[in-house]
């Protein structure tokens, strides 16, 4: 099976079922008659920009990250406001704390923008490490992000 065909099936499965793990995705693919290794699924997830996000019931599930027609920078700033609980800077890194299950989503938005201030991101459940080329650039990024974080308690 071609990669594009497999990825089309993955997209369909993720939109139809609340899949939360690679194992669940592999089981659904197998039920569709598609055999794929965990490494292949992992590559597909990365290439397709699939992220874990909470659904309407608060359960974590895979979703395909897609930008809308909205200005991507505006989407970043809105997401910073909505999901970031705090941000700290250490040398050339910014550590962003988010609401649970939002780390990967925000990191995907940051990565998708290809900002020159960002050398790379490392995301977890509710924390993102954003690496910048140097301390000065990291400070500028910190100030930009911090200005869009909600200070409501």
Swiss-Prot record:
Segments traversing the membrane: none
Cited InterPro entries: Arg_repress (IPR001669), Arg_repress_C (IPR020899), Arg_repress_C_sf (IPR036251), Arg_repress_DNA-bd (IPR020900), WH-like_DNA-bd_sf (IPR036388), WH_DNA-bd_sf (IPR036390)
Main location group: cytoplasm
Pathway: Amino-acid degradation; L-arginine degradation via ADI pathway
UniProt GO MF annotations: arginine binding; DNA binding; DNA-binding transcription factor activity
Keywords: Arginine metabolism, Cytoplasm, DNA-binding, Transcription, Transcription regulation
Entry GO terms, CC: cytoplasm
Localization of this protein: Cytoplasm
Any single GO BP term: regulation of arginine biosynthetic process
Family designation: Belongs to the ArgR family.
PANTHER family listed in its UniProt record: ARGININE REPRESSOR
Protein function: Regulates the transcription of the arc operon, involved in arginine catabolism.
Protein name: Arginine regulator
Source species: Lactiplantibacillus plantarum (strain ATCC BAA-793 / NCIMB 8826 / WCFS1)
Designated gene of the protein: argR1
